[in-house]
């Protein structure tokens, strides 16, 4: 998942609005939907594409073009029935990834059974953090060092094999700093920039979280 994917956020309460705003602020294409016109009005200034619709209705899902969306985030934890219906309709529409906010572990089991690809607890993962994770997913491991800086593991690409870090100029091209190399269970913090990279190893890098998009 990345900035090149299309997103829909269904439910514009505080959590859903935070997810949508963070995605929009980072250049992602986002469709935001809520059944309450007041919530839509409150979000329209920061989220350009906002629609008022009942996403538990099949016709609304079709009209909104949800079948063309890559990732749907359903943010209606207080309404289990609506969340279940929304998950079902989104999966029936062919959405590859459906993420849904839930209120407790029982709801988590139910939502997983009806097809949710990922179920999140808002008290454990903020809306802003979810958006950042969506934008930077695809890495083997990601650790937020601060609000702006993250450390991630990235697989050595096929086109990098046999080349050195000097030749690749990763810092210049992608604004990342290679701090270690993982080879299986072994991690070496002594990074030789003149050593040719091997297939199957991972680079551990530190960079501005948003600039990590360049590596995707």
PLM features per residue range, with description:
Residues 1-216:
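Cytosolic regulatory regions of ion transport systems
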